[in-house]
């Protein structure tokens, strides 16, 4: 906290001799069920633009958000990273694309990627805490919504063609993309394509920590950290006085190495040779979205949606003792629903209904879970009202979840009903500040993995055992925040407490599997429950002012969360505290961004299988410049650097943090052309 105090003092001193510029953009938050924009929302939320995403090169979704207050990442290599919000991850965080849940198998294994392409997006919306219930598919911990304009809700005015090229030094990575949008005789058309190829990424000396008793030649790169991606998406829509209607199709194919699948015995390597674990994914997603303006006595408007996803991931052994063995993970899902606008006068009211069917299967050599059939039905009511100096938001949702599968040859048909609600108050203290209180009670049904996992999971070197008798998690939340923007400084201070009954987590038993499964002698880990509490805070201050011929912006922030069980022990792999500093300068067609993230050491470990993690500093730099060329709307060159200090860095939240550190220093260049 001393660093924050010092920085505030520095900002205060600067403010005595500069001219401030307060011009923060207002953005529509598409995932807001109540249809709010950023000036109307006081919930803990981040909005990240496409420009901000492109400043630092291509990363996984988790790593792209890792420098945001209250948001971290758990990773399994360069392109495999899942977001962590206020210490919660996995099924407690929902990843959405245009408001619809992303239906892949990233929840089954830490080595599985989130199947979302960040090419040609408009923005990413991150909602933290219980207020996420007021947004599309709100979850116990928060949501991440990736927004693009594949299905345009407004007529496109002009044709736009974009080209992009990127190169990264840390893995000799090359990225190419081309995007087109146009209106052809009243039909809005969107096309986007990306191809990426990354070799093994470089790591600092002595970055890999091997298991006790295992030695290996140190290398300057991480084996099997390569990846290839090909993604395209297309959509069409029509917009009329009555509303809009659109369809879209998306395909993503990945081929990537798994950088850790357990340490191999030297005698086995001598006999069978080196082994490579390679995964390939193929997904097709078809969406329908639309809106119809009824203007009736009860219903004003209906927004509707339908989504069909066909996803597969094949994990194959190439070389070594298990050469040719494969495991196929599949997920087929359908989801549909509607949002009914029944607002009256100054009272915003919405009713949301959803239905989802999902079939998840694992076939092959490492089929550690039986096929699971899931059905989910939900209905929710949402209200927003302005009462004097108060703004009130309320949401309540009823969920019914059914899962069918087998566990130890016993068939299970599990029904789980839950009710969640959130109540938010915003009091306007004066023209530049407000105080917000959010109270929430949210429930979460156990996931398929938590219920039915039962087998060897080599990626995490565990024999994982689920429990069909797990109860629903019940979370009670208090979130208090103060926001201000007085044309000199702006900032937010958040304090929160999250009491979770029946918190589900995986714990090592200290025993090993000796039943002859492959791989052999894996540590046994059970999914169990215990009451838990997460307490934390998020502080961020900023200012921007005229400087030289442009505008200079400074922000400082800190986030911290502690997670403990009712018996006083620690929740495993909890996010360490962080200090985040950013400096940005813009002048006409020039932009410069410097980001420094100081990640504190984490010594509050959570029992067997968890270990302390050293702190580190990540320094990132980005410089962008646009040039005027004849016949070109914009030609922009971006120079960027990641981990400029070449620090040994590892995410404490990762199950393979020792064997799979973060990449070393990366220097990159990108070109963006808009016609």
Go through each PLM region and give its residues:
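Surface-exposed extracellular loop regions of Gram-negative outer-membrane beta-barrel proteins
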Residues: 110, 253, 260-267, 310-312, ...
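Extracytoplasmic beta-strand/coil segments of soluble accessory domains associated
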Residues: 62-104
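N-terminal periplasmic accessory domains that precede
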Residues: 61-64, 81-84, 96, 111-114, ...
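Outer membrane beta-barrel strand-and-loop segments of large Gram-negative receptors
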Residues: 224, 327-339, 378-380, 465-471, ...
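Short acidic/polar hinge/loop motifs at secondary-structure boundaries
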Residues: 101-130
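Periplasmic-side early beta-strands and strand-to-turn transitions of outer-membrane beta-barrels
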Residues: 157-162, 175, 179-279
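Flexible loop and strand-edge segments within Gram-negative outer membrane beta-barrel domains
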Residues: 223-229, 243-301, 308-333, 360, ...
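Gram-negative outer-membrane beta-barrel transporters
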Residues: 385-392, 495-500, 517-605
């Amino acid at each position: 906290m001393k660093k924050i105090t010092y920085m505030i003092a520095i900002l205060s001193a600067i403010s005595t001799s500069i001219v401030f510029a307060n011009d923060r953009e207002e953005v529509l938050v598409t995932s807001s069920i109540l249809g709010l924009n950023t000036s109307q929302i006081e919930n803990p939320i981040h909005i990240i633009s496409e420009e901000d995403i492109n400043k630092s090169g291509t990363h996984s979704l988790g790593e792209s958000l890792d420098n945001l207050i209250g948001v971290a990442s758990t990773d399994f290599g360069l392109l495999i990273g899942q977001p962590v919000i206020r210490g919660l991850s996995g099924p407690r965080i929902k990843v959405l694309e245009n408001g619809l849940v992303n239906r892949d198998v990233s929840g089954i294994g830490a080595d599985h990627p989130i199947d979302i392409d960040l090419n040609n997006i408009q923005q990413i919306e991150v909602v933290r805490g219980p207020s996420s219930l007021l947004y599309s598919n709100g979850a116990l911990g928060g949501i991440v919504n990736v927004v693009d304009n594949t299905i345009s809700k407004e007529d496109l005015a002009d044709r736009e063609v974009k080209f992009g090229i990127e190169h990264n030094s840390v893995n000799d990575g090359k990225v190419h993309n081309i995007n087109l949008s146009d209106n052809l005789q009243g039909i809005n058309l969107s096309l986007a394509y990306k191809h990426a190829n990354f070799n093994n990424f470089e790591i600092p000396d002595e970055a890999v920590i091997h298991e006790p008793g295992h030695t290996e030649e140190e290398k300057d790169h991480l084996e099997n950290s390569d990846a290839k991606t090909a993604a395209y998406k297309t959509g069409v829509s029509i917009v009329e006085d009555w509303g809009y209607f659109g369809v879209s199709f998306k395909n993503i194919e990945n081929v990537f190495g798994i950088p850790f699948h357990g340490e191999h015995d030297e005698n086995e390597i001598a006999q069978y040779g080196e082994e490579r674990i390679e995964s390939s994914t193929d997904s097709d997603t078809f969406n329908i979205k639309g809106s119809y303006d009824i203007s009736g006595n009860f219903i004003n408007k209906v927004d509707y949606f339908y989504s069909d996803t066909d996803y597969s991931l094949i994990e194959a052994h190439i070389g070594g003792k298990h050469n040719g063995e494969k495991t196929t993970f599949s997920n087929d899902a359908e989801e549909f629903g509607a949002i009914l606008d029944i607002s009256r006068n100054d009272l915003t009211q919405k009713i949301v209904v959803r239905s989802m069917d999902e079939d998840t299967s694992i076939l092959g050599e490492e089929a550690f879970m039986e096929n699971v059939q899931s059905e989910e039905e939900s209905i929710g009511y949402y209200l927003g009202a302005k009462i004097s100096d108060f703004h009130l938001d309320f949401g309540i949702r009823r969920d019914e979840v059914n899962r069918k599968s087998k566990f130890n040859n016993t068939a299970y048909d599990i029904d789980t009903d839950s009710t969640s609600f959130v109540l938010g108050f915003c009091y306007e203290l004066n023209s530049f500040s407000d105080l917000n209180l959010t109270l929430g009670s949210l429930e979460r049904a156990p996931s398929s993995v938590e219920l039915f996992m039962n087998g060897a999971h080599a990626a995490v070197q565990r024999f994982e055992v689920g429990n069909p008798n797990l109860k629903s998690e019940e979370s009670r939340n208090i979130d208090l925040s103060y926001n201000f923007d007085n044309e000199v400084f702006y900032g937010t201070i958040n304090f929160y407490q999250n009491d979770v009954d029946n918190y589900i987590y995986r714990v090592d038993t200290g025993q090993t599997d000796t039943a002859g499964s492959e791989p052999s002698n894996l540590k046994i880990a059970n999914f169990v429950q215990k009451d838990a509490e997460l307490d934390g805070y998020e502080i961020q201050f900023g200012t921007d002012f005229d400087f030289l011929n442009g505008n200079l912006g400074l922000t400082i922030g800190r986030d911290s969360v502690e997670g403990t069980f009712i018996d006083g022990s620690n929740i495993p792999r909890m996010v360490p505290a962080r200090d985040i500093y950013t400096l940005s300068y813009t002048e006409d067609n020039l932009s410069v961004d410097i980001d420094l993230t100081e990640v504190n050491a984490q010594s509050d470990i959570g029992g067997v299988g968890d270990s302390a993690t050293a702190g580190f500093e990540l320094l990132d730099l980005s410089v962008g410049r646009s040039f005027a060329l004849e016949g070109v709307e914009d030609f922009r060159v971006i120079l960027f650097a990641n981990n400029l200090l070449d620090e040994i860095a590892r995410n404490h939240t990762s199950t393979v943090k020792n064997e799979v550190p973060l990449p070393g220093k990366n220097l990159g260049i990108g070109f963006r052309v808009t016609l």
